[in-house]
Amino acid sequence: MSDGVQERAPRAGGLGVLFMHEVHNVRGRREDHFEAAFREGWMPMLADGDDARLLWYAHHAQGSGPAYTVVTITAVQDGAAWERLALRVQQGDLQKWMRGLDELRHEVEAKLLIPLPWSPLQGVSFDEVPVDGREHELSLYMEDTMWPYQDKFEEYIVRCGDVYARSLERPSSMLTIQAAFQPALGSHLRREVTLMQRIQRPEQLLELLRTHIPPEHRAPGTWMHDALDLRDQWTSRLLRTSAWSPLY
């Protein structure tokens, strides 16, 4: 999990670290080449400077969604670092790499995110992010993305932290929230919340998939019930980190 990379306190006087979230639709026969491009290209090239670091590289778990889909999250130090990174991709040393990457995928959807006030991940200690491709156990994540009602966005963010996130602090919880995000201004849909949740107890996931949620867990006073006053649309991705993903 590389918990040492996390800094709880956001920077004063600015947004601090930005997070570039990308969903790649990879060409099936080039899947291994695509992964190698990130492991041997993007990750070490970013590590040559202080502006950005690759954090997560994860596949859609087999049978859980579109085939050959990869999710990556890259941390960018701040707005100025984002500008420098964009220029490297557009006309600098990353231009050739990006052109080669585009030949390995059909398309990519990207958005720039900032952490919610209560997100466990606020800043990132770049010096502590692994960049050498060291291998480790695979991990499963449930990435939930919600779209609160127009007049309930701010309230949803607060209550999601006060109620839902705190409910996962129990030792028996299936999930632990590693990061919670909303889109940066002007970069994507405004009313969106994304949670990166590590599946601590996979056996509970199987039980969740094969059983109906009991009525007592959907009764008034529960998050499943009360949160419907704030949103009723969301989607979940089941992700499996690569063996070398810096965070897992």
Where are these regions (language model features)?
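An amphipathic, aromatic/His-enriched active-site/gating alpha helix that lines ligand/cofactor pockets
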Residues: 1-14, 32-33, 37-56, 62-67, ...
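Surface-exposed interaction/gating patches
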Residues: 14-33, 117-203, 243-248
